[in-house]
Amino acid sequence: MRRQASLPARRRRRVRRTRVVRRRRRVGRRRH
């Protein structure tokens, strides 16, 4: 149970972090 809950939680956190990084990188390029 702990391994199954950690797998989806880590995948969702990685996806959210990737989206934030991509948006921050796009804003930085547009501001430059």
From Swiss-Prot:
Any one biological process term the GO annotation gives: chromosome condensation
Keywords tagged on the record: Chromosome, Developmental protein, Differentiation, DNA condensation, DNA-binding, Nucleosome core, Nucleus, Spermatogenesis
Gene Ontology CC, one term: nucleus
Entry's Gene Ontology molecular function annotations: DNA binding
Subcellular location: Nucleus; Chromosome
Location, primary (coarse class): nucleus
Tissue expression notes: Testis.
Region (Disordered), start-end ranges: 1-32
Function statement: Protamines substitute for histones in the chromatin of sperm during the haploid phase of spermatogenesis. They compact sperm DNA into a highly condensed, stable and inactive complex.
Protein name (Swiss-Prot/TrEMBL): Protamine
Species for this entry: Oryzias latipes (Japanese rice fish)
